[in-house]
Amino acid sequence: MALVGASTSLLGNHAVAANNQIVNLSKVKVGGTYSFQLKNGAPALLFRTKTGVFAYQTICTHEGGLAKYFAPRKLLVCAVHNASFDPFKKGKVVAGPANKPLPIVKVAIKGEWIVLA
């Protein structure tokens, strides 16, 4: 399955700073996403909505494949077995073979920055 409209960054080429800063708030528009790496190297994807920000690790809970955001369907989809997760419902599995939601990454807005919470 080709993921037309999927995020182009596979592993998140932006790392979290030592002070837990992920990205300046102005760099992620409402409705946008931002790909980054956690301090342990795990890939993650941040979402910004009208009401705030949230993020998930993007390693599939089935067999560890990479889940990429498929914007037209508003789902994170694993490239290995097409497991699908709804980022707007706490990373809930909407199509198997995965049976666990994606791990939540706690984030917050602090001043002009999106940070690890």
Question: How would you name each of these model-derived features?
Answer:
Residues L3-R73, K100-A117:
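N-terminal pre-ligand scaffold of iron-sulfur
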Residues P87-F88:
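Short, acidic, Ser/Thr-enriched surface-loop or helix-capping motifs
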Residues K74-H81, K92-L102:
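Short cysteine/histidine-rich metal-coordination sites, predominantly Zn2+-binding motifs
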